[in-house]
Structure formats: structure tokens, C-alpha cells
């Protein structure tokens, strides 16, 4: 398999704005991540890019922890990059951003993001900032990322 990102690419570890902070997702975020998405399943399914997704689905906290470990392993192996979205002051988990290959596509990568229902007003600002970040700081020529209106 071709590399998702070049070996010499320094993968960003953080993106900080006044509204949110992105950091690599890992199992330490399990409790807050689980609370964020389980409280927002309908909202996530209504978010652009998630309408036809099988996730989120029923999952135990232990299954969620294993999923977070898989995302952390992907990040370490440079095969995909998942970031938790944190509220800057409280450090509460308020969403996630996923950057993964999109095989058999004209796109170099696919990005998806969601925010918890209680922070729905941040969906478009998150999409805008991540879109700009992908264009300026990542080695992709084109990224599929469902637009917001």
C-alpha cells in the first residue's frame, strides 16, 4: 500500500483556535468521548458526511475504548489521523475530526467531523478551520469533506 502521508511529513499534533483545540484522540479520552457521541447520535447522523454512516451505533464504553485505541494506532502508524475536539477552557470533549485515505477515489484523503449536539453552533466553524488547515498544513492535493451551508 502507498503511504498515506510522506515519511518526511511532520504530522500536526495540535490545532488551537479560540473556539476549540484539536489533539490526537487516544484512550485517555474514552469517558468524555463516549459521553459526547452517545448524547448526540441523532445530531451526528444529521451532520454532513454522516447521513449514511453506520456509526455511531450502540457500543459499550469498553468497545469505545478499543475503537479509540485503533484510532491511536492508526495515528502512530500514519495510516489515518483522528483528533479529539476539546473546549479550550474546560478541556471537555466536544467532537472529533477524522482524516483517512479514500481508496479508489480521485481524492487524496477524506475528512469527517462532528460536534456534540450541545455545541452544534461550532460545526460550521470547525469545518471551515479544518478545511483551511488541510489545505495549508497537510500534503494533500484534494480532500473530500462534506461542505456546510
Regions found by a protein language model. Name each.
Residues 1-119, 129, 133-149:
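GNAT-family acyltransferases
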